Amino acid sequence: MIEELGKIDRIIQESVPGKQITLAHVIAAPIEAVYECLGVDHEGAIGVVSLTPNETAIIAADIAGKAANIDICFVDRFTGSVMFSGDIQSVETSLEDILEYFKNSLGFSTVPLTKS
């Protein structure tokens, strides 16, 4: 593919993070295969958040844990991903609190909470 572009001396890729939440989603009733693939023991809803700058995933996980009775499944400060599980109301409450804090306290752009 690169040959098709002609001679290229180098390719430069940059990540220029904004202050934003790009995904806030509740999987209300995941199929068993999702739990198995993710390595999640808890049966219930799963919450997923994606943020930039990536390090803010740590803050989101802390807010989620303080907002409701959820289990933190995954926090990746290198990609800005957070995943947690619990009963559906607790997962929704945690996501709502994350969105509210990041928008109103930190001035982030946010997305609507989605659910499947």
Swiss-Prot record:
Q: What is its main location?
A: other
Keyword field? Bacterial microcompartment, Transport
Could you tell me what this protein does?
Answer: A minor shell protein of the choline degradation-specific bacterial microcompartment (BMC). Proteins such as this one with circularly permuted BMC domains may play a key role in conferring heterogeneity and flexibility in this BMC.
| Coiled-coil ranges per UniProt | none
The record, for PANTHER family, names: BACTERIAL MICROCOMPARTMENT SHELL PROTEIN EUTS (PTHR40449:SF2), ETHANOLAMINE UTILIZATION PROTEIN EUTS (PTHR40449)
Quick one: which gene encodes this?
A: cutR
Query: Pathway it acts in?
Result: Amine and polyamine metabolism; choline degradation
Quick one: a GO cellular component term?
A: bacterial microcompartment
Q: Which family does it belong to?
A: Belongs to the EutS/PduU family.
State where the protein is found: Bacterial microcompartment
**Which ranges carry the BMC circularly permuted domain?**
10-108
Assembly and partners?
A: Has been crystallized in 5 structures (all are mutated, 3 have an N-terminal His-tag), most are homohexameric with a central pore. In two the homohexamer lies flat with a beta-barrel on the flat face created by the protruding N termini of the six chains. In 2 others the hexamer is not flat but has a six-fold screw axis; the screw pitch is 33.8 or 41.9 Angstroms depending on the structure. Interacts with the BMC major shell protein.
**How are the domains described in the entry?**
One side of the hexamer is concave and lined by hydrophobic residues, the other side has a slightly protruding, 6-stranded beta-barrel.
- Official protein name in the record: Bacterial microcompartment shell protein CutR
